[in-house]
Each structure stands twice: as structure tokens, then as C-alpha cells.
Amino acid sequence: MLCVNVELRERSYPIHIGMGLLSEAQVYPLKKGDKVMIVTNPTIAQYYLSSVTDTLEKIGCSVENVQLPEGEQYKTLESLDLIFTALLKANHGRDTSIIALGGGVIGDIAGYAAASYQRGVRFIQIPTTLLAQVDSSVGGKTAVNHKLGKNMIGAFYQPCAVIIDTLTLTTLPKREIHAGLAEVIKYGAILDDEFFTWLEKHITNLVALEQQYLQQCIARCCQIKADVVTRDETEKGERALLNLGHTFGHAIETHLGYGNWLHGEAVATGMMIAAILSNKLGDLSLNDVTRLEKLLIQADLPTASPDTMKAEDYLPHMMRDKKVLAGKLRLVLLKSLGQAYVATDTDKEYVLDAIRTCSKKS
């Protein structure tokens, strides 16, 4: 088992990474008599709910669960209310613990429920998708979507532990594995050129879910994110770099309708647009743009803007991005692979030109 620590003084917590951890009682920060509400969905429940429940009951916990509809389109206030209703009906108090058992959607909703219920209860992340394991389960971002924008209603709320059982990836559809690799590639692109080079060598090992490479990769991604979160928990500066491709990607998700493109797929195309824009602004070399595109293609990810979106369709969504300040668009761009920066007030004609260039690739 590997362990990465997120250092936030009294709110520090471990990220446990290994095979078969769902059944390992010692990784759960719980004790006899604790009340637990597991938030999951029907698909994940059929694979893993009994394993987690059995382990918690052996510890001596009282365990209940609530199962939410599946998919990004259900990351809503209505789903949040289902959690609150389940907690209240079962008389859960401020001493309860909420466990998110699922992917990024479940983690985001359950985390926001934990932040909100009776002004905050204990929260444990058990991410079961690659995207959630390397990204959304770490760092304390919780949210639900609004019809006008993704993740517009939420809070920063740290878990007390993240438990990553890499065996859960064996039941994921291949499309979900590929989508998760977009966030993996992002880490190399923004902050770690050596990791990017490692990915170029081992992307096929990751696609094949070879455990040795998978655990090493997940640990590296978690360490990069943990270091950034330690330095900038609430995204006042450096943490914004973790959003490479996300401003464009969120525009794609919102415009097409949540769930039509997976988050990682939209981020992959968003990274390509950001790379093309960086090149047009004179920063990123054409060779680095090509390397990024090649790696995304090897991960079976889209690198072209959707056929049904015009360049002009992006801007209204992008102007609602949380990084916009004083009405000015702020974008995460690249100077080189491994070196990202936040560009302020980029000329919109350059942005539109980059999107159009990415559209021509389809």
C-alpha cells in the first residue's frame, strides 16, 4: 500500500492507495459506535456496497446508504436533497460520517452534503473511477451543477481520508478509464515534465490497467495535487493551474448537455485548445503541441472541438467560469510541457482562432 499525505495542519489527511483496500478496516478513520451514511449509485452499489458495509459493520459502525441517480446530469440540488432527507429520516446528527462511494459526481455531491449538513460532518472519499482517484477526490472541492454552469454551487471541504482501491478500476468501462487519463496527462503538462515523459513511455501500461504502473501513476498525481493544495487550498493562486483545459472543457459539457461528453473527454479537448492558443501567443512550441496531441490520442481521447459547437458558442459559457475576475477571462496556458501559467485578459480573437483551429482537426 502507498500513502500520500495532504498537509493542512489540523485538517491534514491521508490518501491510501492499493489493491483490496475496501476490505481493510485499518484504512477507515472510524470506530465502534460511529454512524455512517454511504452515498453511492446503483451501479457502484452492486459491485462494492456490500464489501464496504461489511467492513464497517465489523468495526462496529451503524451503516446506512442512499443511492442517487447515475450521471453528471444528476449532479443537482435535487440529488443533494435526497441525501439530506435520508440523513434526517435516519436521525443522523453532527457526529455522523458521510462516505462517498463512487466517481467524481458522487464525491462532489456527497462532499457538499457533508459540508452543509448541520454545518459540517465528517467526510470520507472512496473514489472508484480513475478520474476521481487522481483528481476530484483530493483537495476538498465539492459542488453541484446549475443549468447555467458547472460546479457553480459548492464549498471547499476537506475529507478526513481518501481510500483508493485500484481494483475498482477493473469494473469500469474503458471509456471511463480513458477519460480519467485526461486528468493524469494534465498533471504532467502543467507541473511535471518528467512525469509527462514517463507517461509517453507507459500510457499503454495504464490503459491496460497494469497494477504496478497504475499505483505509481495514481500516487504521483495525488502527490502533485496534494503539494499544490497544501500551498494554495482555496485557489487564490497556484491551484488555478490544475484547471488546464477546464474552462474550455466546462463550456463543452454545459453546451452539449451534462453527460453527453464525459468530463475527461471535454478536458482533453480543452487542453488541446489551450495548447494551440499557447502556441499562437508565442509560448508553447509546435513540437510540444504535437507531443500533447499524440499522448491524448494514445489514451483514446478526443482532440478536436465537437462538430456541433461553433467557436462563438464557447464564450458565453467561459465568461461564467469561476476564474473570471472583473469581467476578464483568465485562462490556464502553457509555456512548455511542465510549465503552466494563468493568462489574464487574453484577446478573445486569439481564443476564437484557437478554437477554430481545434475544430478543423475533426
Swiss-Prot record:
Binding positions for Zn(2+) per the UniProt entry: 183, 246, 263
InterPro entries for this protein: Dehydroquinate_synthase, DHQ_synth_AroB, DHQ_synth_fam, DHQS/DOIS_N, DHQS_C
SUPFAM superfamilies with a match to the protein in the record: Dehydroquinate synthase-like (SSF56796)
GO molecular function, one term: nucleotide binding
Record note on cofactor: Binds 1 divalent metal cation per subunit. Can use either Co(2+) or Zn(2+).
Binding site for NAD(+): 70-75, 104-108, 128-129, 141, 150, 168-171
Cofactor(s) the protein requires to work: Co(2+); Zn(2+); NAD(+)
A Pfam cross-reference name: DHQS_C
Protein localization: Cytoplasm
Enzyme Commission code: 4.2.3.4
Metabolic or biological pathway: Metabolic intermediate biosynthesis; chorismate biosynthesis; chorismate from D-erythrose 4-phosphate and phosphoenolpyruvate: step 2/7
Example of a GO biological process term: chorismate biosynthetic process
Main location: cytoplasm
Keyword Methyltransferase: no
Annotated keywords: Amino-acid biosynthesis, Aromatic amino acid biosynthesis, Cobalt, Cytoplasm, Lyase, Metal-binding, NAD, Nucleotide-binding, Zinc
Reaction equations catalysed: 7-phospho-2-dehydro-3-deoxy-D-arabino-heptonate = 3-dehydroquinate + phosphate
GO CC annotations, alphabetized: cytoplasm
Family of this protein: Belongs to the sugar phosphate cyclases superfamily. Dehydroquinate synthase family.
UniProt function note: Catalyzes the conversion of 3-deoxy-D-arabino-heptulosonate 7-phosphate (DAHP) to dehydroquinate (DHQ).
Descriptive protein name: 3-dehydroquinate synthase
